[in-house]
Amino acid sequence: MPAKYTLRYLTLVTNSTIAAELRPSTWSPLRHATFRALWIAGLVSDFGAWMHEVGEAWLMTSLSPSPLLVALLTSADSLAIFLFSLPAGALADVLDRRRLAIFTQVWLLVAALTLAVLTYEGAMTPWLLISLSFVMSIGAAVDAPVWQAIVPDLIPRDELPQAVALGGVSINIARAVAPALGGLIIASIGPYAVFLFNAITFFYVIAVLARWRPRSAKANLPPERLLGAVQSGLRYARNSPELLAVFFRTGVALFASSCLLALLPVLARRELSLGSTGYGLLYGCMGAGALLSVALLPTLRAKLSEDATLAAGSIVFASVLVTLSLLHNAWLAGGAILIGGVAWLAMLSSLNVGVQTATPSWVRARVLSIYMIVFQAAIALGGLVWGTLAERRSLRMAFLAAGAAMLVGTLVGRKWFRLSGRAPDFSPSLHWPKPVLVRQPGAEDGPVMVTFDYQVPAENQKRFIRAAKRLEPLRRRSGAYQWDLYRDPSKKDRFVETYIVDSWADHLRQHERLTVEERNAEARVRKLLLAGTSALVTHLVEVDAETELKAEPADQD
């Protein structure tokens, strides 16, 4: 699976998407003109992308017989996404998404056109190809969260699952057909032709985006600063056990499966003696398997949990890796890869469901960027490891080791990192009252300490401490970078909860981010308080003494 071009799809999957049954309503988002135009543009771009991917991989096998260099092509793609995805997610949450999307399409257009010209002129080298692939992946890293954030603005909320399902259909139609088509073009014209076709597809996407005029909503608060937005995304993910489990399972699945993704060109050319057309057909088997999975997954999901679906897909994919290490027949290899495509989508859909259902909308682009970082870091590391193993030992050894790694990782994940299958209630609660102030802080004034003063009877104090401790990850996820619980030794029943956020604007954002889950957690704390009392809330804004003193005349002695 190409690292550069599947990211848009990864960021759009929800719990009712890939495995969604193709009900008539699945097509309903196409009634909306802007969504329809962008969906068609995406389909055209997907065809160009998969053809481009086949061209890159085949060109590298022509430039160098080294399995390591072929694998490094995948690793370079993943490294770019690893480095740039999180800042890109923050940008998608705070900048004009339409302009950012147009910028990324222009970036990708220029990079693809450069690759086409240099290949046509015979000036391409292995390391230049890796470098240009890295440059294109930077554009893809920025593009993915932008598309994720755009789609909900194009359609009614109740049609979002169907819209995302259509995104999956687009990707997998292209993945099933485009590699074989790309192989035919490479065989008849040359790799430069598929690079040129890919560049041309970006013109259409740019034209559609240029015509789109999104609805602009007036923001009540200034946009987050880039660094602060990145930090809040990391803080949210770090304090979500559900997300940490998804990230571990993603790392395991992608590290092992990257063996097939990175070394398929070597398998096709060296072990199966295929040309570019045969390689394209072999690549297309993975996409055909993924399309087949769309029909099979609803039945599977009706019987298995997300965690069990992930485990089943992982075991089947591990079996495919082991099988490919033993095969020398192209037809049998194609059948195995077809089954691998089914298993791949079963794994991917379960992971995507896990990350989407564990993330509220305000931080979704950033969390999905972290997910993509884990995704691509695992592919990059795996490509390096399996490519090195194939070069120093054998291709068979690399596939066997990858299959074993998948099985071991699945067992560890099932034991300690299970997908909960529980979707937290992220419905806005807005249950905090507006602070009563005699002096209005500036948006960037801070840090701000918020305190909750509790009175707790002795018989409830242990239960209170446990309940209050459960508030810590919720406070941190909504913006706090420090949280503490204090006991007053001068009073038998007084406890004080404190947390600190960067600025007054960040605290006001917390008010907007409150969910039913947090309201319920706070209600459990309140039940343990002294009868007739409630939490006393105060807000303390740090004094910038230098600024305050400059604003007032000096005191006269």
Walk through the language-model features, giving the residues of each:
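Short amphipathic alpha-helical segments
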Residues: E459-W483
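An amphipathic, aromatic/His-enriched active-site/gating alpha helix that lines ligand/cofactor pockets
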Residues: L419-R422, P473-Q482, I500-V537
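Short beta-strand/turn micro-motifs at beta-sheet edges
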Residues: W58, P435-A443, D484-Y486
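Short, intrinsically disordered terminal tails adjacent to the first/last structured region
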Residues: M1-E21, V436-P447, R466-K469, P473, ...
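Short, highly charged, low-complexity non-transmembrane loops/tails of multi-pass membrane proteins
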Residues: P424-V438
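Alpha-helical transmembrane-bundle signature of multi-pass membrane transport and export proteins
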Residues: K4-R418
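Short, well-ordered beta-strand segments in beta-rich or mixed alpha/beta enzyme
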Residues: L389, V448-Q455, D484-R513
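A short beta-turn/loop motif at secondary-structure boundaries
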Residues: Y486-K492, L529, V541-V543
